[in-house]
């Protein structure tokens, strides 16, 4: 148990174009998984199976007729964009599932739950930071890639928060939330909307800057992981105080674990300058 609590796993996403699957194909693979799951669910319903088999055939036909690789050399910005798509299409949902599965194993075998702040996995990347191997990677490219990463994170958090806000229609809440929102039949929704709105502002401001070169007002953006976690902790404490531990350990806990893992940038960026370092060493 203590070994698991102290795990520290660093995973680095490469920017090499030969290791990047086309997002179109990744989405097709997800569709096939969904169809296969539905086929198992409706195995005793011939009419439904016929429809699912047609969908499966269509998806496979499209995949067979789709090129695995893009035939145009990608820019460093494109490489980063494709890499971030992996987070949205796979890692964003996979990370909390892994933690939840691991927690189930410990709960079953050791009668202990993992700490609520359990977060052994961190993602790193040198997409947009490869100053050693790619002469097209400049300081401006790195800056844009980091902004793109923040844009991606804000978009994902906004979507997750919107889902929770729609779900949390409960009226009973803690005094801390009540003092913040005043009299409300939907205190959790009122309390979480400012955070969701700030995600939306962050997402749209960065998009306007990257597309139309509009200046960014950093004061209006989400600037730290703690800005996400603090209100979520207050909501979790309120739910636990009102005998709603099962709700607190559901989508809210998943979102908190995502926030701990990904922060405001889904990956931490490393600048590779090994070639310049070796040259400097030889000169000395």
Language-model segments: what does each one mean?
Residues 1-278, 284:
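Often metal-dependent polyanion-binding catalytic scaffolds in large enzymes
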